[in-house]
Design a protein with these regions (language model features):
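A signal for long, low-complexity, Ser/Thr/Asn-enriched, surface-exposed stalk/shaft
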Residues: 1-31
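Glycine- and small/polar-enriched repetitive beta-structure motifs of secreted/surface proteins
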Residues: 23-377
Length: 377
């Protein structure tokens, strides 16, 4: 033991590679304690940076087996913290990764996986060569293997299928179990608790809102925004559905080419095709009708199976009780509303044809034909 009394220092050993073991407590005071191996690496924990002859520089490995197998050239600038985190670094050019959490990025073994950020228990655990992924949350992106450019934030976000390697690129999943089932699907955006949670191979969809699109598995190209929007879609026939608003299109299973905007817009549609409903409760009773257009609060609001009608204005064709009412055109507040039987009518003006019961009628003007029962021809 050498004591330098002029500075108050205590020196142990004769060279920098001497090993020192302490039994009991070790109390160190002062400004810092350095764990530097001469290459600007810091390794703390059993087997951290465990490979002999490691030549990488400027790495931080903290935890048992952190960077255990690291031995490739240019393995630099990594921050790895946690049991088995980054354990399999064995290739050249594995650099600039941030892995924090038990087994985070444990199987990365290719320089292609550089610039990965995985934070959370098992986050990115199956990544081998997938590059530039950002994964934050317990088991976020767990089954991603070779996929690139994904962002998963939240518990089980983009978790994937334990039996299928995740290879889909360029997905964004934010929220508890958002895109949880993703395997090969690509270029999806899912934001919200359980948004798109069952999607496996679906692609190029935008799903925003808690439980929005949560039954989708393979359906591509949907835009679903709002709580439970498109929540029952489960068939590829419903591809390219647009449903915006709480519960918009919530019952659609296989209905095609729908555009639904507003709270409860088209909420009851199951298999109807090519409907466009814009407005609070617009088309909210329709189930299997097709090629209808409704614009305004509660427009076309009570028709169940009607087809090829146009309703523009609040309550236009709004409380139509004829379930199969078809080929009607109504423009104006309440136009054609409360019609119990009738098809192929034209109602233009506020309350035009209101309470009318006939078919093939044309009523133009405020309250024109209100309460009428005439049919023509």
């Amino acid at each position: 033991i050498s004591i330098a009394t002029n500075s108050g220092s205590v020196n142990f050993g004769d060279s920098g590679d001497d090993i020192h073991r302490f039994t009991g407590s070790l109390d160190i005071s002062g400004s810092r304690i350095s764990f530097d191996d001469g290459k600007q690496n810091i390794a703390i924990g059993t087997n951290s940076i465990g490979a002999s002859g490691f030549t990488g520089t400027t790495n931080i490995a903290i935890g048992e087996n952190a960077m255990l197998d690291a031995n490739g050239a240019n393995t630099n600038y990594n921050i790895v913290i946690g049991y088995n985190a980054g354990k399999s670094f064995g290739a050249n050019n594995v650099y600039s990764n941030i892995l924090i959490g038990r087994q985070a990025g444990m199987n990365i073994n290719s320089g292609d996986a550089s610039n990965t950020i995985a934070i959370g228990t098992n986050a990115g655990i199956d990544i081998t060569s997938g590059q530039r992924n950002l994964l934050i949350g317990t088991e976020a992106g767990t089954n991603i293997s070779t996929a690139d450019y994904n962002v998963a934030i939240g518990y089980h976000a983009m978790h994937g299928d334990d039996s299928t390697a995740g290879t889909g690129n360029s997905n964004i999943a934010v929220g508890y179990e958002a895109l949880k089932g993703a395997t090969t699907g690509y270029e999806n955006v899912a934001i919200g608790n359980s948004a798109g949670t069952s999607a496996t191979t679906a692609y190029r969809s935008v799903i925003i809102g808690a439980s929005a699109g949560d039954a989708i598995t393979t359906t591509p190209g949907v835009v679903l925004i709002g709580y439970n929007a498109g929540g029952a879609i489960n068939h590829d026939d419903a591809a390219y559905t647009v449903a915006i608003g709480q519960n918009a299109g919530a019952a659609i299973t296989s209905g095609r080419y729908q555009t639904l905007v507003g709270y409860n817009a088209g909420v009851s549609i199951t298999e109807g095709d090519s409907n466009t409903f814009i407005g609070h409760n617009s088309g909210d009773a329709l189930t299997t009708g097709l090629e209808n257009t409704a614009l305004g609060y509660s427009s076309l609001g009570a028709n169940i199976t009607g087809q090829r009608s146009v309703a523009i204005g609040n309550n236009a064709l709004g409380t139509n009780l004829a379930s199969g009412w078809t080929y009607n055109t109504a423009v104006g507040w309440g136009a054609g509303s409360n019609n119990t039987v009738g098809s192929s009518g034209t109602f233009i003006g506020s309350k035009a044809g209101y309470n009318a019961t006939g078919s093939y009628n044309t009523f133009v003007g405020t309250s024109a034909g209100e309460g009428g029962t005439t049919s023509a021809p």
